[in-house]
């Protein structure tokens, strides 16, 4: 289970070029030396808040293409959940096994299914976790999400209310690929 570390949550909102370098070094499995060099250059030339958000999304984001297979979406979010998530495709949609329970996510077998799946996962985990969209990814054909516990989201909202609202969008019934 991947979890968003406290120092990385704070990095999202505060930090200079040296902090960008430290973040990159904490995540060598994500950032090759060439990519690290590119991000350091960007941190020197571009708005730091945008660079920090981009880095954070590379490490903790769940990236969903508008053509993504729905079972793969479940698998990707499952990496951020405790325990095993098992998904099976059925004639009606998806069947998930999570935390000892079985859940169904009915699908329409249309492009709308990406967000039907995401909302279905969000409903299943809503007692402990929340999924939010990186706003900067909305107008793309690939959306990036972050899954964190309610405790983590609440702590961020208490300390960085305006910034959280600016960076993330809550998942709503209307939200879909543009």
Label each region the model flagged:
Residues 1-178:
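Contiguous interface-forming segments/domains that mediate binding rather than catalysis
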């Amino acid at each position: 289970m991947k979890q968003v570390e406290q120092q990385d949550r704070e990095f999202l909102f505060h930090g200079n070029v040296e902090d960008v370098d430290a973040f990159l070094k904490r995540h060598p499995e994500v950032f090759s030396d060439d990519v690290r060099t590119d991000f350091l250059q960007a941190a020197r030339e571009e708005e730091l808040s945008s660079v920090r958000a981009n880095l954070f999304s590379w490490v903790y984001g769940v990236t969903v293409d508008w053509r993504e297979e729905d079972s793969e979406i479940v698998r990707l979010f499952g990496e951020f959940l405790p325990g095993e998530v098992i998904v099976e495709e059925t004639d009606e949609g998806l069947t998930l096994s999570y935390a000892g329970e079985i859940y169904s996510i009915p699908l329409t077998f249309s492009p709308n299914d990406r967000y039907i799946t995401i909302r279905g996962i969000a409903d299943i985990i809503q007692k402990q976790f929340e999924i939010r969209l990186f706003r900067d990814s909305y107008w793309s054909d690939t959306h990036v999400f972050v899954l964190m516990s309610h405790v983590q989201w609440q702590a961020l909202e208490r300390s960085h209310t305006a910034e959280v609202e600016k960076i993330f969008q809550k998942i709503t019934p209307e939200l879909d690929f543009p």
